[in-house]
Amino acid sequence: MISFFSSDVSKLPLCESIVATLCLIRPDFPADVVTKELQNRVEEARSYVISEKKIDGKLKKLIELFYSHWKFGSATGVYKLSDVLWLDNVLKTRKGTAVSLGAIFLHIAQQLHLPLMPVIFPTQLILRCDEFNKKMWLINPFNGETLDEHVLEVWLKGNISPTAELYKNDLKKAQYLTVIRKMLGTLKNALIEEKNMELALNVSNTLLRINPNDPYEIRDRGLIYAQLECNHIALTDLIYFVEHCPEDPISEIIKIQIHSIEKKKFVLH
């Protein structure tokens, strides 16, 4: 199990870090099953790409295997967002998000010694390889398709702002810890939306192990505690946020929440 205080998570394999982190959050997370499944996928992929000698050929074969034969991809229809983030479920259903699919694909690629890296683009995680004809090769982890600058600019203008522009910094390699934080943030919000407050609290506490003094995460934990009617703890967290971020417009809303909690009878757990 990872200690965020004594280990440099960014130096561990991404999937290994995610599996260990999910064990902190979900006591029943089947780490051994997930690890074995990942090993099996790696061995199958190794056999599938063995005929290719060049890096770009191996990567193209892996994309073919992952998306066309194994049929990993984005979820459709009605589904719970948390289901496409838990790695055990993603491996079972083969449906995931850009982060969960990207983490699995990246794990397999790295075991095959393919020079792939994660990029936290403003709209989603993407994968990057710099060895293809010495030119940056960008891959959409949802479907394995190659991304070009035009597509990325369309994403920015459609999701961020009509005046948004693509900058070189948007395509820099992301540290694994940054990827994990992004995944956990999405998982936390999904669990809150699904009213699974106990697990959401576990996610929030895990995020605070990574960055113990983050006032925004402390605020979110306070709001989760309020939902769980742990009002005395909720107040401590919410007051911390207001004191540390007095200029944030959200502080006024949080003050109303604090006042509402103070009017209630404390429920001690």
Q: Where are the model-predicted features located?
A:
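A structural boundary/capping signal
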Residues: 1-269
